[in-house]
Amino acid sequence: MTDQVQDENKLIAERRAKLDMIRKNCKANGHPNDFRRDSLAADLQATFGEKTKPELEEEGHIVAIAGRVMAKRGPFLAIQDVSGRIQAYADKTVQKELKEKYSGLDIGDIIGVKGQLHLSGKGDLYVTMDNYELLTKALRPLPEKFHGLTDQETRYRQRYVDLIVNEDSRNTMIMRSKVVSAIRNFMMKKDFMEVETPMMHVIPGGATARPFITHHNALDIDMYLRVAPELYLKRLVVGGFERVFEINRNFRNEGLSPRHNPEFTMMEFYMAYADYNDLMDLTEEMLSSIATDLHGSPKLPYGDAIVDFGGPYPRISMLNAIKQYNPDNAEIQALTYEQVADRELMANIARGLDIYVEKFWTCGQLLEEIFGETAEPQLMQPTFITEYPADISPLARRNDTNDFITDRFEFFIGGREVANGFSELNDAQDQDQRFKAQVNAKDAGDDEAMYYDADYITALEHGLPPTAGQGIGIDRLVMLFTNTHTIRDVILFPALRPQNKA
């Protein structure tokens, strides 16, 4: 046992002893629930922060505050609530009472204070502790440094502690909530209806990904946590809901990385009588307005760069993007779509770029891998990459002039994909053949290939109007809006390996 652990155990024991005494001497077994707060720290600062000391003395405002004790400096306690901090003042009489009643207050304790609002000599607001009550005794000490935990893993495992001591973490999560609300409000103003679709599927679908499997005991069947809501949302468009969206969780049984968490949040939406160009226009409008509303400007810092959400954003085909970022590769510069359809040629180009080639990869997958390795990391500014191959886009509409590609785009910022959208495939017979090709790919070893969904084919046979649909990764978008570089920092409780496993 380390000295640090021994010291912490000693502090916990001391606090438990204090709580035992408090239980005997105070009401509600030491956990009262009848104190009512009427003011938040930030509201008091906004309302009274510009007042002079004589003005506050004359006006005599009585306020009730409550929060966590974060610091003790002589007679002053720094009390933190959801909005910020404010000081409470304990004169010598109150200090004596606190010691007698509670054996003193500790950092982390939650208290309620009612008293008059004053201004200190340094210009800080404080509340006199005319009436006070210990609401919750903290049995564990907080980290000593107020800027947060130094160990990243502990920050994620004990997010509750991280949020207490780390203002940056609190602000990140507040911004996340604002981003989600702004997206929801934008969509509703565009006449989209918010819906909820199943989280458990009999057949996983809507994206090429490996699903999580669970078992329904009553039905005695395996079910899958959804990898995407796409097929259900398009069923709703078939049913006549022409503009729908959903903000919810998706689950993909894949690896962890700074940009991947197995449980993540997506906003997916579908609009009838539109195509993928309309989606790109809508995305530009949405992100520009949200950035301006939340940050006061469409230009946001991200790492060493400034990301400009103002638009319009470049629209570049995948093939041209590969050429743009491989200017010295003569073989790539000479590529045509006819050559991209030559698997052996594409595999050799990929190997020449030190890309490992899976035997089941199609021509489209090879093109996408080359793009991902050489072009994607360079896309720092908002950019639409278009003309995705049909064999990696099983739900997208084929292009009218080139059936090797689809009317699909992916949206990139900061060197990572943030959104994926396309004109929807509404040809039931073509969709049937694409599903069968996915089944063949799965049989060949591609764990992420889609399953065949017969009911979705039946829905298409009833008629899906010309439709465009898109998914936006909320977590990655929040990373951009908060200048954060790992997805774990924008998810309250990210997936972690259990501590008792190596």
UniProtKB/Swiss-Prot annotation:
Q: Which SUPFAM superfamilies match?
A: Class II aaRS and biotin synthetases (SSF55681), Nucleic acid-binding proteins (SSF50249)
Tell me how the cofactor is bound: Binds 3 Mg(2+) ions per subunit.
First-tier enzyme category under EC: ligase
Could you tell me the keywords of this UniProt record? Answer: Aminoacyl-tRNA synthetase, ATP-binding, Cytoplasm, Ligase, Magnesium, Metal-binding, Nucleotide-binding, Protein biosynthesis
Please list the residues that bind Mg(2+) 2.
E417
Its needed co-factors are: Mg(2+)
Q: Which residues form a coiled coil?
A: none
What is the catalytic activity of this protein? tRNA(Lys) + L-lysine + ATP = L-lysyl-tRNA(Lys) + AMP + diphosphate
Q: Name one GO molecular function term.
A: lysine-tRNA ligase activity
Positions that bind Mg(2+) 1: E410, E417
Query: Where on the tree of life does the source sit, at the highest rank?
Result: Bacteria
Q: Which InterPro entries match?
A: Aa-tRNA-synt_II, aa-tRNA-synth_II, aa-tRNA-synth_II/BPL/LPL, Lys-tRNA-ligase_II, Lys-tRNA-ligase_II_N, Lys-tRNA-synth_II_C, NA-bd_OB-fold, NA-bd_OB_tRNA
Question: One GO CC annotation, please?
Answer: cytosol
Family the UniProt entry places it in: Belongs to the class-II aminoacyl-tRNA synthetase family.
The UniProt entry, under NCBIfam families, shows: lysS_bact, PRK00484.1
Q: PANTHER family recorded for this chain? A: LYSINE--TRNA LIGASE, CHLOROPLASTIC_MITOCHONDRIAL, LYSYL-TRNA SYNTHETASE
Q: State what protein this is by name.
A: Lysine--tRNA ligase
The gene that this protein is the product of is lysS
